[in-house]
Amino acid sequence: MSPVSAIPLAYKLCLPRSLISSSRELNPLHITIPNLGMCRRGKSMAPASMSMILTAAVSDDDRVQRRRGNYHSNLWDDDFIQSLSTPYGEPSYRESAERLKGEIKKMFRSMSKEDEELITPLNDLIQRLWMVDSVERLGIDRHFKNEIKSALDYVYSYWNEKGIGCGRDSVVADLNSTALGFRTLRLHGYNVSSEVLKVFEDQNGQFACSPSKTEGEIRSALNLYRASLIAFPGEKVMEDAEIFSSRYLKEAVQKIPDCSLSQEIAYALEYGWHTNMPRLEARNYMDVFGHPSSPWLKKNKTQYMDGEKLLELAKLEFNIFHSLQQEELQYISRWWKDSGLPKLAFSRHRHVEYYTLGSCIATDPKHRAFRLGFVKTCHLNTVLDDIYDTFGTMDEIELFTEAVRRWDPSETESLPDYMKGVYMVLYEALTEMAQEAEKTQGRDTLNYARKAWEIYLDSYIQEAKWIASGYLPTFQEYFENGKISSAYRAAALTPILTLDVPLPEYILKGIDFPSRFNDLASSFLRLRGDTRCYKADRARGEEASCISCYMKDNPGSTEEDALNHINSMINEIIKELNWELLRPDSNIPMPARKHAFDITRALHHLYKYRDGFSVATKETKSLVSRMVLEPVTL
């Protein structure tokens, strides 16, 4: 099974009439078969006690028994989606937002004009860092790119290997200013070394936070924790910082009352960096920022920025984008319904969930093509996943793979009707996405994308062959093929090509296959997906996973041993992904790198607690409601 799942960028695509309305429509025939297993990832047969729901594909001259995943149906009725409405698309809200943007830009500019009461040589660094950190976490930073750069250039001009204090004339460096400065500067591409944190570490791995846990020391530990998650490979001090700060914060949050700081800590410990998403963080930080105990809304001589204006703009921006989300979601729901894909009852239909992820990644309104392309790509991947892993026969999936390789709709007569429809959806989707990409790239990228999908489908064929032969591969065999079948490349490539940044092929290969970035992202999704799905898969008779293959290679090892090994691999991959995102010698435009990186974060979020895609009735349903369906209260 692929941890990513997908469908393309077409609107008026319909499955063949024979599938939708004729007497040859697939009719489900529920049969209990005790000796057959459902295999989605290249698994062996189930034990004799395994019960299975099969669907018989009935035609005049053919009767094929087919396996079904028995997934729950789509949770979001099209009538409900089309009924959504919001007032936040009205011009008056945009006018208010524009006014606030101007006022906040004045706040940034005023920081360069020192005020004896508000901005002094003893607080000028931390004031700038607070301001930048706040607009970024509130999700409004895209409006202040120049102001952010100016503020960080100023901070960096006073940066040194012994850390910084609150201001340029501070006599002693402090952990809070240094940790926040290090994190912010590193994320913006400045050359800062993690060695600066050693200034605050003793020989026992303890950092400069006393056991008394005052509010100031707790905030220092929080910023140390946030900084530690942006680690590169080999940075021992970052490992020490994460261990110390996470333990310190877990103890502290038990002792302090419910307040903005406790909420901030709880969120940081829960989602960290690699299961976080820009829009999710913005929604949470509005609650933290606007809490009655929040220091950001208190007007005093040490707090320069007008927190109320920042919060007001953040809420307006969230709701204005929310109105755009509803329009796009209504389009996606119509597209899904009109395509005929709902007739494929055997497949998972998670277009709404995928739209939620896509809009949590790409929060700039102008990136509509990315959001819609991501949804369609991911949904099509899901349909193909369910065809190749459960519903389709070996003969059918080989025919389909060959049809994709030929790329000619006139040569699909050998396909069963349901596959003809899916093929046409794929064909039209990739064609339309290539047309969208041509607007930004200035060249035809269709053949490039097609090759990526051919390789992806070949990986499914390999897994199907393992199923048919009952072969349990070695860890390395499974992992190398599984990186491709994770579908990261298929899901990420075409949406990224629609971004408004030039990606000539020689640069594109630095983020696409066979780049280190692509290999790491695909590895990450395969490993994380397997750790969340292997028990449910095994219960359905699907044996092959990173866990089972590791245990095969290491006789006598336990599931716990395998999970420890895989989680260790994931931790190292995360650090390498950080480096690939932030490395100073990269020639890949940061918007492309960041969106590719955020796709891994979004999908990691989906697998944080469970397979949140196959089981979308719990945390994923709540995410949809909070991120897409519900505005914030102004």
From Swiss-Prot:
Domain commentary: The Asp-Asp-Xaa-Xaa-Asp/Glu (DDXXD/E) motif is important for the catalytic activity, presumably through binding to Mg(2+).
Chief localisation class: plastid
Secreted as UniProt keyword: no
Database matches in Gene3D superfamilies: Farnesyl Diphosphate Synthase, Terpene synthase, N-terminal domain
Induction context: Accumulates in apical leaders upon wounding in resistant but not in susceptible to white pine weevil (Pissodes strobi) plants.
Binding site for Mg(2+) 3: G529, D537
Annotated EC: 4.2.3.16
Protein name in UniProt: (-)-limonene synthase, chloroplastic
Cited function: Monoterpene synthase (mono-TPS) involved in the biosynthesis of monoterpene natural products. Catalyzes the conversion of (2E)-geranyl diphosphate (GPP) into (-)-limonene. Not able to use geranylgeranyl pyrophosphate (GGPP) and farnesyl pyrophosphate (FPP) as substrates.
GO CC term (a single one): chloroplast
Residues annotated as transit peptide in the record: 1-21
Pathway field: Secondary metabolite biosynthesis; terpenoid biosynthesis; Terpene metabolism; oleoresin biosynthesis
Top-level lineage group: Eukaryota
Keyword Chloroplast in record: yes
Catalytic activity, as annotated: (2E)-geranyl diphosphate = (4S)-limonene + diphosphate
PANTHER family: (E,E)-GERANYLLINALOOL SYNTHASE (PTHR31739:SF25), ENT-COPALYL DIPHOSPHATE SYNTHASE, CHLOROPLASTIC (PTHR31739)
Gene symbol of the encoding locus: TPS-Lim
Motif window: DDXXD motif: 385-389
